[in-house]
Structures are given as structure tokens and as C-alpha cells.
Amino acid sequence: MTSTPATSLGDMDHEYNQDDIAIIGMACRLAGGIQSIEQFWNAILSKKDASGEIPEMRWEPYFRRDSRNAEILKKTTSRGYFLDRLENFDASFFGISPLEAELMDPQQRIALEVTWEALEHAGISVTSLAGSDTAVFMGVNSDDYSRLLLEDVPGVEAWMGIGTAFCGIPNRISYTLDLHGPSTAVDAACASGLVAVHHGRQALLAGESKLAIVGGVNALIGPGLTRVLDEAGAVTPEGRCRSFDDSASGYGRGEGASVLVLKRLSEAIIDGDKVLAVLKGSAVGQDGKTNGIMSPNQVAQEEVARKALSVARVDPLSVAFVEAHATSTPVGDPCEVAAIASVYGSGAGRPKDLPCKIGSVKPNVGHLEAGAGSTSLIKAVLAVSNGIFPPQANFQTPNRKMDWDNNSLEVIRGVSDWVQDRKRAGICSYGYGGTVAHAVIEQAPAPNFGPEDQVGDVVYADAAPYLLFWSAPQSQRLRETAAQLASWVGETEQPLADIANTLAYRRSQHQHRCAVVADNREEAVKLLELGSQNADSPWMIKEKVSNYGKKGAVWVFSGHGAHWTDMGKELLASEPAFYGAVSSIDNIVRDILNFSPLEALENGDLKTTDKQQVLTYAMQVGLSAVLRSKGAQPAAVIGHSVGEIAASVTAGCLTIQEGAFIVSQRAKLYRLVAGRGAMILVDLSPEDAVKELEEQGQTGAVAVAIHSSPNTCVLSGGIEAINELEQSLKDKHIQARRVKTDVAFHSPVLNELAEPLLELISGHIKPQQPKIRLYSTSLTQARGDNLRDEKYWIDNMIQPVLLTNAVKAALEDDFGIFLEVSSHPIIAHSINETIIEADSDGVIFPTLRRDKPSRKCILFALGKLHCHGAPIDLRANFSGDWTRDVPTTVWKHNPFWRKVGTGSLQPNKSVTHDVKSHVLLGAKHQVVGSDTTMWTTTLDESTRPFPGSHPLHGTEIVPAAVLLNTFLHTGEEYNALKDVILRVPVAMSAPRNIQIVKEQGRVRIVSRLQASEGENNNTESSWLTHTTGHVANNEWSKSSLDISATKKKLPSVKPSFATDYLASVGVPDMGFPWKVTEHYGEGDEMLSRVDTAPESSEKSIPWDVSSWAPILDAATSIGSSIFYKEPVLRMPAQIDEVAITPGSIPKVAYIHTTVETGMWRVNVAILNEEGHEVAHINGMRFSAVEGTPGASGSVESLVHQMSWPPAKLEEEGFQLKNVVFVSEQSDRVAAYIQDLQKRKVSTTVVPNPAGLEEQNLSSEGTIVAYLPSGSDLEEDTAKFSSTFCSEVLDIAKLLVNQKSPSKLWCITQGLFEAFSPSSLSQGPLVGLSRIIASEHPEVWGGLVDTDDESFPLQAVKYVKSVDVISVRDSVARVARLRPVPRSKIVTGREKTFTPTAEGTYLITGGLGALGLETAKWMVESGARRLILVSRRGLPPRRKWVDSNDDSAISTIRKLERLGASIHVVAADISKPDGAERLEQALDLLDLPSISGVVHAAGVLEDQLVAETTKESFDRVLAPKVSGAMALHQLFPPKTLEFFVLFSSCGQLLGFPGQASYASGNAFLDTFADFRRNQGDNIVSFLWTSWNGLGMASSTEYINAELEAKGITSVSRDEAFRAWEHAIKHDIHQAVVLRALPVEENGIPPLPILDEIAPRKRAESSGTEAVSKGEVSEKAPVPKSGPELKEYLQNAISECVAKTLRLPSAADVDPSTALTEMGMDSVMTVSLRKHLQTSLKVTVPPTLIWGHPTVNHLVKWFEEKI
């Protein structure tokens, strides 16, 4: 746009009404490389036609998808108006991960960026809209990307839902910008964009929103709709619009986005917005019943246009220009032009010689369909705002179907001026479904100038210096923005003040911020260029918003010594606020001291101490006034010495005049002692300085006057004493520097002034409580709220300045930004030392500097405050005009495009097999001169000929049933196969070419990897024969089977018998979804009822009805299970005959399997439900798969027991110097102390964690040892369990909060033996220990359980990074999981864990997911009487009819239909009376005595250790501990046949957030030991996650967390197979989990898995050799320093980039929060895995939560490496 005369207004013009809407911002992205409004306007004026060919990548998947597409796509219109790089998007700017960006419709991406640009064009800080009621209405109509992604069903992912939905476009904008107003997608076909504008207007008028973002977007990705429009004749083959032209034959489709920002005109004027145009009115209608739904309707268009004019209160004859829809269709254009003529032309009485101008933007940028209306509106706005009638592109000969001679309309051929005073335009839009929209706009109101105002060139006052801000979401972007600004600022004529204003409050303020302070344009450009080069300058600021930013800044008013000759002179002349503050105290100072502060500052008269004191105060209150006038406000204040007076004034305790009175009277008294004192700054801590004074006998003559920092202080006293002390310190090489003063401030020298000062100021001040936080440096308690009365100012004069205390208090209160308000920084260094000592990342910076330009310094300080994130009202300092011409955001685009799996097009092999028919028959070729037929196809993941998964050793293979089905389909005449040999499975590990060859009845399947083509192209060496056989057409006798009699003959077995068996031998999944619903027999004969499509009805089978593969797959799979007694994975190897009855494939069938006596040959008959045979497989032989574990081996891989091998001892032990015991005094404590004292280790005993507050836990070599001691009464178990956990948590929290180097050790005795209730109470500590070790390894030493009275010195000193240790016979041992050896199988046991029909079984947590699954399994296993105990219970049975949605009721009904009797008892056994209440409930049931108990009750409330509360912890602990003890009371040991506890392996592996849950489960494990010691038949199952069930049910996050720990979940069936397997072994704790494999020489993520994690067999290859070579040459990790930091930053950034799928580590901003870059909770688990692998350091699960950026992680790893 050449110029933008739109303006902000004072008073509204009388012709504008309250319903007028201001258009204040616009942006677009259109074909022809149009990226801005200016480029769009230039394209219109130059009549540019942006049409062209569609980019090749758009339709490429459709060429691959189906060979038939190629021919049709060649006939489809491929020309149109396309964006250059539709796939490009700046994902990182919006904090969107590459993975999510790839799954987002490009329309969402474009709309997001263009919306941002529109808001910037409007001069709105986008980030300021967060939380507002801003509305978003976006027109959208294309679902091309959605179809592309969702039709690739195997590739569908969760994010594709919102990522490709229409609603996702406005909703994504609202979500990203945190907008809370209406957010709606508008689909009105081609009218969508203008309808969205209408809805935005309505939302503003209704008061729903104060701002509306409206527009439309369109993307042309797939050919489908273009093909539709081709068929309908709507688009022209040339892909070019020719609106109003006689040659028009249809439209050219266009893509892009256009967005406008709307606000009520009255509010836009108040807000100082620059109005581009006024939306006077709009209307939307529908053409109703017409000749056809897609036929345009002239009458409807006229009606809607007149309604819009009526709403706008505009005379149609005052409208000089109409932007028509004008798609260039033969029917649409004449109809629309006639409607326009009726409303605006001759029909309205317009003279022919003054025609209404019309035009259409479509020949320039195409028909954007959903974005067409908003694009037309932008063109119209540009026309009225620039006062130009825009010329029509592609217009030569007027359309002869239009009555140009009489309609009083004229198409604009060339650029012409718009001379009317009041420029108005109409905009038309309609959709092919009948929606009609119309809008009326008017030029922006002109500004109202007063009579004295200059009209013409605006004269700006000199606002130098200038503060220019810019910011970015990531630090790397700052350079690009600086470069862009430098170039533009150097060329533009816009006033620098306007540019500064725009950047300050009309641009978004991101986390990474820069600022420069410049006196003029040349300096600004130079500084910006330095910023673009990442160089530094004294007047440049580069910061990231601090964590302390929101808290605000602490203003620190320093004391004596900051003065310099010309201080304040510049400010008196240029800052009214400064002059006002100083002048307000001038008379007071004159009266008391007989001099004028104003004159003294003007003349630089600061020679005497009294003037220095008063002028220090004057400068500070003046600077405070200036800072506040420029929008800064203190959040807290600190005063240093005399600076406390100005601090108290700033805090509201004193008036400025009271402060002046105090400082003047004090200064007058200082004249009495001037010349008698001196002060020196020394490099000694205040404590060391006191010792030094004592050594030299100077304590009476010299005082520690100022506690400057932890390592420095100021000494004050008489001149001789200071001289002597100074020399003595220098002799000791202790730095001492003179303070420029002749008064011994804050020393006994001033005692003589106390009474005179009190007398002088008494009654003259009325101190108030501070209005903001005020830290004292005169009181020992910095937060003291003492009134700043007369006594306070006496203390302030004499007592030491406790600056360090005040700064520490502020840091403890989470302040971190300090601004020294003084004429020169004199205490910044000291404050910085305190900040560093506190291990804070706080900052301190000055307001002014000696001999530097004062206004420039103040602006620099404001810039520092803002860049650190301190709240500032920027409008207070930047109050002038602004310009929308400041460049918008620089996008860093990367391509994001989902490559869908639509197959790969091969030369001459474009026809692939029919996936739904489950065959591999592709393109058919007849070999000339022979009877050989060949079919060729390509097999890969996208052409998988079966719907499920069929892995073998982790490699997906094609099921044998598909191969058999393929052979049967090689000819319609075939109904049988003979002599089938299945040699090698067809693997799907890589794309391969398949050939099916049929020759003289013999068929074979051969393949070759595509990767091998070209290498052996002329040989047969790379072709592999998989399966051979003969096809036949034989008559065969079909037998029948009496189904009912066979069922009675064979024993009933659970339906999952075959699939359970297959899973146990390593086949967890089936290639087809068949399901066994009934199963009989498990010996030499079996009968199975199979549903091949259990989720489908007879009429909706999800595959071709001609496919025999699903039922053949069930037959071959079930057939192999007949050998279950000798479990090993078997695959079909040979088949004598397969026979079928063509056309009679049943959905539900019976499979009758028999084995030939004495042979390994299986015969399978496939029968319909009447028992008639429809197919058979005879003579099927199997081959065992080498290396596949058998059934027992497979279950053994799930069930493990705990072992305790000796721990590895470190060569250099921990230097133990001090042990702080937390324990009651006891014989054990006494023995430990005596043992340690012999080894020269000091000891302290505190009775509880609170006692640690008084202990020094920061000294080297110190540990905290917690010794639990409880009661041997069983009834006290729950109480002490809670107490022990609570105390350990308190200690851990204290150490974490203090950042103490001391580690916590928990020392128990006899816990693992579990012979006493006391050891039982300690059981939860085992689980708690592992969670603390996981979340806070920095404070955890270990839990050590001992078997004697000796202190476990070996464990504490020499065992490193082990969370739990067992010391037995003085040997430290560590926990490891081991497989349960077969030698432990126990036979002939008297007791069992298997339920029977005679028993009564009780399940706690019985209505929970695991409880119900246990109930189902027990009934399946024979149980017929169950009692389900639950806290919530169920409604009375009479109400069950209304509770169909309750899964518990549904399950119970099913179990009762199976013959079981189910009783539900509502009882909370975690309560103190839980046992009694449960006993009463059982008595009422009057059932036989309980035979077995399953304790599955539990509650989960995840909380991190540092955040957990005792209430929450106990809620989780109680069901496990109190619940188990209640059952223990009801069912003493040896009174049950079995007792089963449901625990969790999470406490072994340290799952974060599960401190309470792990503690409860660890108790159950100890409880199992405790009862086992008493002869009970009990087992505790430490479960991993069950897929989709329980409190740790598998979710994406849980699965990722499990994998990070080195394990995975188990299925429900696997869990109960593990139960059955575990009961064969005499183990009391069965750990059930599946360990993930690691490399042959690799290390599992957790040491406890070391002995059970499978090892991958290393492959010897050239690639491996190269890899090893690369590893061996890898540079060593630097030891420390900058090299280590750089190494870690690169390594961690690479891990982050890998997790987020970023192009490279360079795209990772080390200071940006990972969540802002798009990382979610699942990704954090993956990142931990990458970090552990890369850096060989164990990473706590909570690390990334507490270390949110790469820089934070670098700091953590620096300490670890």
C-alpha cells in the first residue's frame, strides 16, 4: 500500500453511528508471492494475474494411490492460483512441535500466521489479548488435508482430529493466543469469508466481544473437489478467472488466507487505533428454493444487498464502487451483475453518465472460495482508504450477456482517482449452496483539527533519546528482527518517536527481549545492526524475561558516596517530574541549611557532607518521581543508610517534605562531627571483621558500619583508628578501600548526635505504614514493620546498615530484580555478591551512571526492567503517535507435510493387490506362447493384505492364510490346493516386489526386496521362493459333525485357550480380528466356535466377502494350539490339502481340530453353525521356530523374584565426618554413636525432624540418619507406618528446600525379615525411599536395613547411588530381579491359590477395574461364590434396571449368568472400625467361611515429594495398610486357603509422583513376608501396568514412562497367566513385568533389571564396524569449564531436537521452556531416555519438570558429570 491515510480520531463525525464497526487491521497471503497488504494492492494496481500450475507434490499421493487415478488426473484442471510453499510454517514461533505441525491442516497454519500479521497491522500487541473476550470467526470449506491424512487409515493419529477439523482453524487461533471469546468456523461455501465478517460484526454489536478477528482461508491439496467442479463445468481448464469478460468460461480456483481485525468505531477512536475503513452494515441470507441448489438467484442477492444498505443507513446512490463476487461462470456473473444494477445502478435511478464502478479481485488471485469474501473486502478497504478505483485484470471485451448500455455500471479498466468526498463501497459474496452475503463500507473518518493545528506536514517534538524494543519467543530470532528493523529504520521517513511507540506497546512482548537507547536515527540503525550481528553495546540490552518478572522490581536507594558534580543538571532541564520533586523540598532545605537544592544541583555545589547528604536525598526522590512518571513502579524498596529516607518516602511511610526535614536536620548535625571520621570498605565478612577488630583491640574505636555483602563490609571510626586499621589490613594483604567521606557514619562517633536529632525532629513527622513491601536495613529483622518514627531515624543514623539481611529477605520472598535508585551505582556490586551467595539468578542494575547522559540512562534502566519482565506501563513513557508500517514478524519457515502411505508407483507395476480381498495378486501378465500367468505387486506397510498385526521375533510377516487365499484366487475354477509347502515367511520389514507365478497348475510366491533391485537386476539370485503348491478343481465329500454331541463329549475350556497359548509362545497378536466365543477340548480333539468379524454385523464385514483368509487364519492358528502340552512356537510348514466350497464363507464357523494318532499331522474342518463342512485343511504339519521361547519360558519372562547380590563397593569412600541422628534415644542409637566415635565421626541426636532446623547441614561430610522406632503391637502398625513416612518426608523436604549437600539415610533393623509388627510398620519406607531417590537423588543417601547393632558404615561410605540396601552378615547387598528357576516348582502342595466351586472368595476393591477382572477370572477358573468389597457399594438390585451404564453391574450380571453367586458389600476397611464393620456385613450374608482373599483395594493421588501433604499421603496409604491389617484381624494366618495382595512394581522402579502409592504397596510386600513367617499361604503380586485397566492403566504417558524405566505393560490375560505360573513356585513376592531388551553389552535403565533384561544379539556387519569406529573416535567429555558447558548444551539440544523432530540442534533455543517449544508429558519421557543414552547419567523422572530449559538442564548435568 503506497500510503495509509486512515487515522486515529478525536471527536466522532456526526454522520457515524454507534453501530459502525472499524476495520483496524488486515493481512493476507495470496498467490503470486503476495505476503502483505502492500504487495496485494500493488498486484491489483498492476493488474497482475497470479495463475499457474499446481505444485507437483500436491497430487503426488493420488498418483501413487491407484493406477486408475493417473488417467483421470491428466484430464483434471491443474491450473489455478497457488501459494508458493503451502507446506511452510513457523511452528517454533507458536510453540508447536514439528510432529503436531505436520498433523495440522495447512489452513490452520496459514490462518495462525496471517492472524498474527493482521493484529500487528492493527497495532495490537498480540500477547496482550491473552484472556480477553476476542472473537474469532474464520471461513473454511476445504477438507483436502483431512481427507489426505484420514483416508490413510493405518497412519491415523490422535492429533489429526483437531489438526484437520474445520473448527480447528479458529479454535487453534483462540487456543494459541489464549482468546476466550466466540471461536467459530463458518462454512457457507464461497460466501464463508464475508459471512465470517458478518458474524464478527454481530458479536461486537451484541457486546460478546470487544475485538473480532474475521476472515477466510482456502488450501487446494487434493484433486477431488477440482474434479467435481470440472464435472459441473464451474472451473475453466485454463485455471484463470476472467470476471465480466466475454471469454469467461469458469473460474480458476485459488488458495490463501485473508484476515481482518474489527472493533467498534467508538472504542477504536478511544484506543487510538488507526481506522482503515468503517464497516457500516452487513447482511446474510439464503436464496431458498430455486431451480437447483447450486443455481444463483438474482432476487435473493438484491434482497440481501438492500438489507445491508438498510442496516448501514446508506443511500445506494452514494456507493460509488461495488466489489463483485464475479467468479467468471456463464450463469453466475450475468445474474450477479443484474442484481448489482438493480440495487446500485439503473434500478436505483443512477444516471448512465455517472455509473457505479464494479470490479472483482478474482482474476488477480483466483477464487479463494471460503476466503473469497474476506479477500474482496480487503480490496474494497484498500480502494476507499487510498482513494483509487482499482483496475480490473483479465478484462478485454465486456460480457455480451450483460446490459452494459443500460445498467449504469462500469467495469474499471485502468487506475483512476476516486474523487467523491465520502467514499463508500459494497461487497458481494455468495456460495453455491445458496448463502448470500453483502457488506457496505466507508472510508475512515478524517481527524478533527483545531484552528491552531497545522494541516499538512506534522511537526514532532524532539523526543530524544529513544528507547526501541524488540522481542521474540526464541533468542535466535532476535538477530533476524534486528536486521529487519535496522534496514527499515534506515530507509523510512517515519519519526523515530512513532517507531519507538509502536515497538513498545503495539507489538507483542515475547520472553526474549532486546532494547537499544539512541539519540538519533543514525545511532539507532547502528545499534540495531550490532544487534543483528549478536554484538554488544553499552546502550543495548539483551535479556530473557526473568522468573521474578511478574513479582516486580525492588528499588534500592543507596547511601552516601554516589554524588558527582553535574548530577541532576540535565534532569532539571528536561524532566518535569524531577524538577517538581526537587522544587517541593527547596524551601525546607533553605530554612534549615541555608542553601537551595535546585541551585546546588544547577551549579554542581556538593563540596560538604551536609550538601552531599541532602542532594543524595533530592536525587533519589527526583529519580523515583521520574521513574514513576514513565510507567515504572516498585514492588518493594530497600534503603541503604541515608537512602532509607527516600525509600520510606517512596513506600508511602513519609511525605517528601517529611523526608527532606529529617535529612536536612541530620545533615545540619553532621557539621558538628565533620572532619573527625573516616570509613573503609574491606574484603572481610562482617563476622571476620569483628574478629579482626577484636584481635587489634579496636572494638571501641571502630565499628562494622555496613554489612555490604556476605564477603565485604564497611568499617567506620575515628581518623587515626581507621588509618591504623587500614595499614594493618594491607600488611595482611586484605583489600581495604577508603570511602569518600569525613564523617564516621553508623559508628559510636555519632552517639553524641542522637539526642539533638531526636529533639529536632520530634513532632514534625507523622509516619504511616508502608503501602508496598519495605525492607529495613536498620533492624535485625529486615521484614520488621516498625513505624519509621523518630526513634527509627536515630537508629538509622547510628546502627550498622544491614544491607545483606535486607537483600537476602527480598530474595527469600522471590524477588530477583533490583534497581539501584541513585546518581551512580555504589552498592550494586555488594548486592550482586549477595545474590551469587544465595545461588540466585537475580540481577541488579543502576538508574544513572556518573558522567553519562541522565535521560539516556533512565531509559536504559526502564529497558532493563522491561526486558527482565518487570511490569511497566509502557504507554506512560511512549505517549505519542504510532505507525503501522513497522515491519511485522519475521517468519522462520520450515516445511511440514505428512507423507501418506498410499503405496509406491513402480514402472510397469502400477496395479497393486486388493488389500480387502487379502490376496497378493496385482497386475496380471500372460506369458506369450505358454500357459504361464504371472501377477506382480508391491508389498509394504501401506499395502498390508491383512488388517491386524502378525509379528514373529518382532518382524511383521504375512499370515499363511493370506498366501493360501492368494493361491485359491488365481482362478475362479479352483476350489482346492494340494501339496502346499510353506518354506520362508513373507516378511514386511522392508518394501518388496512380489510375483505370483502359475504354470501348469503349479503356483508359487516369490519376492525380492526393492533395495536389491539394480544390484542383481539381470540375475535371479535376489528372488526368494516363499510358498509353493498346486491348484485344483476337485470334487470332495463334505462331512458333517454333530455339534451338540461334540460339545457334550469334550470338556469346556475358556474361550481364550488358543490365543492365550499363542501369546505365551510369542504370538501376541493375530493378523485378523477373529475371536473364539466357545472352546471345547484340549487334547487330541478340539471344537472352537469362531466369529471372524466380532465387531461387525453379517451385512457389514469389513473386507471382501470372497476372502477365505480370516477363517483360514483362525484354522491354522487354533490348529497349532493342539500341541499345547509341548509349548513352542510352531508355524505351518506343509499341508496336504486345502479345500473350500466356493461362495459359502461363513462369518461364524466351528473349527474342528484333530491330530492323527501318533503323528504330528493336524486335520482341521471348518463347519457352518449347522455342522456342515464348508472347508478343510488336511495333513497340516508344523515346524518349530528356532530361538522362540516355549510357553513356560515366555511366562517366566514375566514373573520374577527378588534377589540380593553383594553391592559393588567404590574404591574411594565418602568422607563421613558428622552424623545427625533423627531418633528417640535408644540402645541402638547409643551403640551407633559409640561405634562412630571410635572412627572419629561426630554425632548429634535430635528427637524429630523439626530439630534439624537448628543443625548445620551444610558442612562437608555430614549425613542425616533417620532411625524409625515403633511398637510391637499389631494394632499400632498403621499409626506408626504413617508417622515414619511423614517424618522421612519432612526431612527430605527440608533438605531439598535448604539445598543442603547432606544426604538422608534411613536405617531400619530387621525390616526384610518381617518377624515383628515393628518391622512391618517400617515396610512403607522401602517404597518411599525409592520414590525420593528417583525425584530427588541429590538428597537421598539410601535405606539400609541391618541385622545387627553395628552402624552400617560400609553401606554409607562405599555404596553409591543405590536407593535401598540390605546389610546381612556385615555385607551390603542390593536388590535385583531374577527369573524364577524351574527348580523352584513345588509339587504336591497341600494348599493352592486356585479357586474352586466349593469355596467362598472375598475381593477388596472388588468394584474397581482390577477387582472386577479378578472376579471374572476367578469365575472362569471355577469359583461360584464371590464377595466384592468396595467403599462405594452398589444401589439396591431393584434399581439395577436403571443402571445399565454401570460397568460393575453389567459385569456382575454376566458372572451371575455363568452360574456364579456375587455379593457386594459396601465397607471401607481403611477406617479404624473397618474390620468390625466388614465382619458384621459377612455375618449378615450367612455364607460358608471365606476360603481366599484378594486384597486389590487402592487409591491413587499422585503428588511430587516436595508438594505432597500428609492428608493426601494418608488417604492413599490407608487402603493398603489399614485395609490389610483389617483383613489380618479378620482372617488370621493359616485360616485361609490363600491370601493374594495386589501391589505394584512402581515402588521398585521409582515412578515419580507415587510416593504414597509406592509406600502402601511396599507395606503389602512386607506384610506378605510377615504372614508367610507365620505359616500363611500368601503372595504379593508386584504388577506392572495392565493394558487399559487399573490405577496405572496404560496410557500414552504411562507407556512412555514404563519404557523409560525399561519395562512394558502386560495384558489382562498375561497377568492371570502370571498368577497361575507364580503359584507353582514357593515365592512370597512375585514381580510381574516384561523387561525390554537392551543391546548385547548395554545397560538397562535401572540396575534392578540387569539380570532379567533380554540382550539383543549384535549383528556383525560392515555398518557395525563403521559405527564402532565412529564411537571410538568420539571426542572425550570435557572435565569442566566453558568446554563442558558447550559440550552439554550441544548434546542436550540434540536430544531435544530428536524428541521434538526438529531439523537440527540449532533450532533449539537453550533459554526457551521446552513446553513452549511443543514438548508434552509423553515427550519428556522420551527426552529422558535420549539424555540417559547420550550422557550416560541416570536422569530422575522429575528432572525436566524442575529444569524447564536446556540451560537449566546444562547446569544440572554440569554438577553430575
From Swiss-Prot:
Region (Malonyl-CoA:ACP transacylase (MAT) domain): 554-870
Enzyme Commission number: 2.3.1.165
Region named C-terminal hotdog fold: 1050-1191
GO molecular function, one term: oxidoreductase activity
InterPro entries cross-referenced by the UniProt entry: Ac_transferase_dom_sf (IPR001227), ACP-like_sf (IPR036736), Acyl_transferase_dom (IPR014043), Acyl_Trfase/lysoPLipase (IPR016035), Ketoacyl_synth_AS (IPR018201), Ketoacyl_synth_C (IPR014031), Ketoacyl_synth_N (IPR014030), Malonyl_transacylase_ACP-bd (IPR016036)
Transmembrane annotation, as ranges: none
Region (N-terminal hotdog fold): 918-1038
O-(pantetheine 4'-phosphoryl)serine: modified positions: S1721
Domain Carrier residues, every copy: 1686-1761
Pathway: Secondary metabolite biosynthesis; terpenoid biosynthesis
Dehydratase (DH) domain: annotated segments: 918-1187
Null allele phenotype: Abolishes the production of arthrobotrisins A to D and arthrosporol A. Displays significant increases in the trap formation and the nematicidal activity. Develops far more adhesive trapping devices and traps and increases the number of captured nematodes by the traps. Shows significantly increased ammonia levels in fungal mycelia.
Function (record text): 6-methylsalicylic acid synthase; part of the gene cluster that mediates the biosynthesis of sesquiterpenyl epoxy-cyclohexenoids (SECs) such as anthrobotrisins and arthrosporols, metabolites that possess a novel hybrid carbon skeleton consisting of a polyketide-derived epoxycyclohexenol combined with a terpenoid-derived monocyclic sesquiterpenol substructure (PKS-PTS hybrid). The SEC pathway plays an important role for fungal soil colonization via decreasing fungal nematode-capturing ability.
Name of the featured protein: 6-methylsalicylic acid synthase AOL_s00215g283
Organism: Arthrobotrys oligospora (strain ATCC 24927 / CBS 115.81 / DSM 1491)
